[in-house]
């Protein structure tokens, strides 16, 4: 791996993102921006840092961290830039120090009100080098997805609103060279209001994908055509997509498949809700990772998970057919909160040698306000991940319990424990891990 490749990828994206932010700062008044941030110093003891099955090594890790959340909801600029960076220092030298960062950013500049917007979007995250291996420090890498381009709004007759989007997309991975790509995407949309809370839209999308690295994967063109029906009621939201997708590869191959998506949310009461998502479509890792960042300001504020920041995506640029379903029940009471449900996801890669996989399991989060300044949080997840080509099957179980205490509006602390278990059918990939954790946080 060359130093040039490690530096050049992030440098291009950082320069483009900085240009977009500078443009927005110039266009928006200073008082329109709001900045929240936190500083944290954490100490953890990990009894199996490298997640070894036969030779566990324990260590104590000190982790200073900085998180920020910058927002603007003005008429000319709408933006949310949220991130966290942490530096992990291993006292017993079980592993070298780590600098890890995550960032979600979306910026929309209204160049001509009602006519022309310019969008800049970026996501930096930590993901595994190999999804089949345990989440040890030597199996982590930074990846980045950057997108930018104009959106043009127009009318088609008296009742149909039109929209044209052009995006340049750049993807980069620190170690997985097969993820690096440049893309150009064009979308045309027309939406008609059918009645109160009901909209029907027609969508045409085309994308050119050029993958860096000769022989790693074939470049290809992707085309999507689908109808979207959206219904919003007082206690129920429904969105249905139906259409078709085509993939045309430069090496002469082609694939096609129906595009089906359904998303429903039912607010059963003032405090409870039930949501479900099901889909069958062509996708790829870059698309699935950048989708959570949207123009409606739903970028999650930065938080620090127990242990190291890390994701669970297979990092490559290969397209796959995704079949997935997720059900979530949520409750938000005066003292207690709960969210959880099952999930299932199957990825069938278009390439014969792709890492086809099936994952299913369940996850939940529970919170309880013990007093005005004490809160208990519990997170749990179980998953079975099976790689179809090799037959490798990994069962993982994760449990975390944390007690948060607030001292002043700015100062707080948390202490807790996490347990991670991994049972693999492949020799050497099973492991258990216990982490004890304490942290002091300043929030502004």
Predicted regions and their residues:
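Cleavable N-terminal export/targeting peptides
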Residues: 1-34
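Gram-negative and organellar
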Residues: 31-444
């Amino acid at each position: 791996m060359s130093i040039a490749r490690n530096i050049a990828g992030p440098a291009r994206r950082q320069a483009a993102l900085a240009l977009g932010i500078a443009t927005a700062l110039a266009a928006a008044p200073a008082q329109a921006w709001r900045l929240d941030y936190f500083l944290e110093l954490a100490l953890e003891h990990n009894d199996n840092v490298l997640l070894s099955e036969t030779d566990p090594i324990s260590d104590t890790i000190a982790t200073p961290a900085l998180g920020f959340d910058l927002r603007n909801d003005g008429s000319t600029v709408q933006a949310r830039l949220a991130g966290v960076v942490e530096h992990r220092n291993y006292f017993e030298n079980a592993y070298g120090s780590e600098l890890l960062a995550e960032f979600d950013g979306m910026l929309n500049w209204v160049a001509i009100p009602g006519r022309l917007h310019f969008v800049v979007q970026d996501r930096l995250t930590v993901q595994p080098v190999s999804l089949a291996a345990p989440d040890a420090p030597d199996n982590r890498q930074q990846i980045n997805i950057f997108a930018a381009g104009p959106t043009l709004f127009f009318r088609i007759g008296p009742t149909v609103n039109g929209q044209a989007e052009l995006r340049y997309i750049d993807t980069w991975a620190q170690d997985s060279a097969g993820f690096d790509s440049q893309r150009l995407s064009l979308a045309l949309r027309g939406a008609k209001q059918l009645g109160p809370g009901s909209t029907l839209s027609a969508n045409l999308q085309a994308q050119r994908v050029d993958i860096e690295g000769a022989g790693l994967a074939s470049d290809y063109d992707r085309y999507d055509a689908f109808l979207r029906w959206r219904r919003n009621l007082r206690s129920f939201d429904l969105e249905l997509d139906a259409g078709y997708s085509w993939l045309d590869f430069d090496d002469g191959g082609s694939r096609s498949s129906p595009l089906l998506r359904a998303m429903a949310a039912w607010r059963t009461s003032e405090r409870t809700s039930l949501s479900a998502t099901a889909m069958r479509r062509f996708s790829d890792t870059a698309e699935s990772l950048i989708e959570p960042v949207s123009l409606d300001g739903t970028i999650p504020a930065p938080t620090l998970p127990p242990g190291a920041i890390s994701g669970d995506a297979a990092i490559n640029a290969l397209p796959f057919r995704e079949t997935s379903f997720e059900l979530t029940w949520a409750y938000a009471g005066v003292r207690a909160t709960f969210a959880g449900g099952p999930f299932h996801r199957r990825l069938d890669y278009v390439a014969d040698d792709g890492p086809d996989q099936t994952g299913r399991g369940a996850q939940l989060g529970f919170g309880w306000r013990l007093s005005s300044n004490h809160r208990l949080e519990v997170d749990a997840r179980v998953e079975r991940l099976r790689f179809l080509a090799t037959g490798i099957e990994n069962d993982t179980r994760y449990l975390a319990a944390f007690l948060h205490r607030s001292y002043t509006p700015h100062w707080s602390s948390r202490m807790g424990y996490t347990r991670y278990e991994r049972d693999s059918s492949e020799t050497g990939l099973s492991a258990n891990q216990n982490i004890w954790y304490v942290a002091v946080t300043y929030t502004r």
